């Protein structure tokens, strides 16, 4: 009886431990603030810096962050391409964070608005070798993907003009994910966010949002999903947080599973997440047979990212949080975990995510992105208050670019506990068998009768 109780208790503990797949919601004490600023400060020469402070500091804001294999944090600062007098004084559209200042990368000359190659960067990616993939918006309305070596030399240029829209900067390339196993890049084109509706005297959303597919080997490009429901904002979605309202924006976030089999994408204003097999995207002839699955997510979001552990991270606009879920295991997103929670940033929202693959930290950028979007980039920042933040939190995870390791979400301590409990269970089962054996009635050896004894004696004689 005692052994049975012990075994039952061990099984109960074992069952509860293996259910602990992800830590509870993180508190603010778990989060390290690594950057805070009222306005962006650039590490440039004195003359250029003074011109920037005079003309552009109220308009420059960070959009995307990434971390290379050496732990260097890169930040994009888009030039809005609506006022050359403002844009040309923003020193760098792609920068590294150094001593709480932004240093144009690879140098100031390459970022020069008139003479440099890099005009305006919204989204970009860094591969495991440290190469940078920059979605460049040229001031002449052309679009291209610039690939740079870690030392700042240009490695390759991909012309995207065949699949982008050039009239009045109608293509806004916001995010890119890389499949370097099969040499493909997937890019979200939000389309021109605003379009004047002169009949009603207001600004309305454009419907040119699309997904671009680029073959990195032969440089062929495909544009698809234009005017499809999965690429358009959900106008019926209720706004749950009035302080963090957002315009009706199309495709923005995109994620690639670590096994490179699935693309996940979503318009900004949508609680739907769309999933499509990458095999359908790699050949224009198979696009008509594409099978798009619809999942759910908890909030409108700017950026999403999958990880090497098979987890799905995304920014939540209404909840002002970074959420994480087992995207392949719980397709309804019913058990979302919050990596950061609490509405203590007023009208700031999390907009970008980045992993440090060496340390296992998740970095996320918080800014007033919604102010620029909601006011058609006509409102200046209030530089008397903090506007930009970058935080990091330990998640023991890495980017989707690393090989999949989907079972590593179970902590080492849990694995040790599982092994110990398994040994205890084995020992308990062994003790139970021994106990049952001892309690079993033994057969008594029957003594020979007189006739048998006489027969035995005769045989012996």
Regions found by a protein language model. Give the residues of each.
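Cytosolic C-terminal tails of single-pass type I membrane
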Residues: 442-461
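Surface-exposed loop and turn segments in beta-propeller and other repeat-based domains
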Residues: 34-55, 100-116, 155-168, 220-245, ...
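Beta-propeller blade signature
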Residues: 89-100, 143-152, 204-219, 379-398
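Residue position within the beta-strands of beta-propeller blades
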Residues: 74-76, 134-135, 186-188, 265, ...
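Blade-level signature of beta-propeller repeat domains, shared across WD40, Kelch, NHL, RCC1
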Residues: 350-415
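Residue-level signature of beta-propeller blades and closely related beta-rich strand-turn architectures
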Residues: 79-81, 138, 190-191, 269, ...
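Beta-rich, blade/repeat-based domains predominating
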Residues: 55-69, 112-131, 163-188, 192-193, ...
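Beta-strand-rich domains and repeat architectures in extracellular enzymes and scaffolds
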Residues: 30-92
